[in-house]
Curated annotation (Swiss-Prot):
This is Cell division protein FtsB. Its main location: membrane. Part of a complex composed of FtsB, FtsL and FtsQ. Residues 1-3 are cytoplasmic. HAMAP family: FtsB (MF_00599). Residues 29-62 form a coiled coil. Pfam families: DivIC. Keywords: Cell cycle, Cell division, Cell inner membrane, Cell membrane, Coiled coil, Membrane, Transmembrane, Transmembrane helix. Residues 22-89 are periplasmic. The gene is ftsB. It is a single-pass type II membrane protein.
Length: 89
């Protein structure tokens, strides 16, 4: 009777090890779920960024105000008879 119990205990330990630590076990599934959640958040950030960039592109295509704002802020252009003061901190 004792050898059968020892074999069953060894088999139980082996199965538990495979369940928890082997490839496809609970630990690896947990790590995969964390990676999936991280990737979902990263994808959402990129979607938001793309949406903002598409809105900027649309403004530049159809709005003169956006073009003027871009020229003033990014390129440092000014209108005729206008004085530009740049304050350096």
């Amino acid at each position: 009777m004792r050898p059968i119990i020892a074999i069953l205990i060894a088999l139980f330990i082996l199965l538990q090890y495979q369940l928890w630590f082997a490839a496809g076990g609970i630990v690896s599934v947990h790590h995969l779920n964390e990676n999936i959640n991280h990737q979902i958040m990263e994808n959402q950030k990129l979607k938001d960024r793309n949406t903002a960039l598409l809105a900027d592109i649309d403004d530049l295509k159809h709005g003169a105000e956006a073009i003027e704002e871009h020229a003033r802020n990014d390129l440092g252009m000014i209108k005729k008879n206008e004085v530009f003061y740049q304050i350096v901190k």
